[in-house]
Amino acid sequence: TGGGAMMSAEKSLENAVEKAGISKDDIVRIVTTGYGRAYINSGDDSITEITCHAKGAHYLNPNVRTVIDIGGQDIKAISIDENGAVKNFLMNDKCAAGTGRFLEMMARTLGLSLEEMSTMGLEWKENIVISSMCTVFAESEVVSLVAQNKAVSDIIHGLNMSVASKVGALAARLGQDNPGEYMMTGGVAKNKGITNALEEKLGAKLYICDEAQLCGALGAALFAYEKCREA
């Protein structure tokens, strides 16, 4: 966010044009999205990440009607229509619980990388319940479980199920009679333990693209393309 977002955006743009073998002058239109979009002055248009995720999800799979986005800062449940337009959306409260940041903190508490945490969460045997979704209290629970010599894989599975319960409850509050096909976007979609737990809670299969964390960026690019065609 802030100046950091502006610097990151400029660096990302430089890397992108270099990789594509073009110059900045070749770019006709730029659309910014995400939390830091308000701080980026180089864009022609600024569109919310909710609208961009819906656009990107529809492009990748036109049958999707519910998008679950779990990023570093928040969780979103988005209902979209047959054209990819947003019908309704809900976000978690300002607490970090269940977000990518929450998982990073739990991984650090367990002395693991996020990749290790994702793999180990699939190897669980005992169904441990993490009762608190508050980051501070959940961390305390994890420390207590480690002291009780509980298997780390079981603790991770408990965390995964807690996250899935929170996300599932958010999706249910959308109040859709027919939620259609589900897509999960955001970096947390790379965590197989989370996706398995969420599929169990939703009672449905999640469509996950190869680079789920770029779905919003894809949507922004599609909006830029449409603007160019209209010009």
Language-model-derived ranges and their functions:
Residues A138-R173, Q213:
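Adenine-nucleotide phosphate-binding core of ATP-dependent small-molecule kinases
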Residues T1-G2, E82-E126, L222, E226:
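Glycine-rich phosphate-binding loop plus the immediately following alpha-helix
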Residues Y35-N88, A172, G219-R229:
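Conserved phosphate-binding catalytic cores of ATP/NTP-utilizing and phosphoryl-transfer enzymes
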Residues T1-E49, E199-C209, A231:
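N-terminal glycine/serine-rich phosphate-binding loop of ATP-dependent small-molecule kinases
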Residues T1, D45-A54, I68-G72, L90-G98, ...:
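Active-site nucleophile and cofactor-binding loops and adjacent substrate-binding regions
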Residues D26-G34, G71-E82, M133-S140, V188-G203:
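Acidic-glycine-rich active-site phosphate/pyrophosphate-binding loop
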Residues Y35, G175-K201, A212-G216:
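Glycine-rich phosphate-binding loops at beta-strand->alpha-helix junctions
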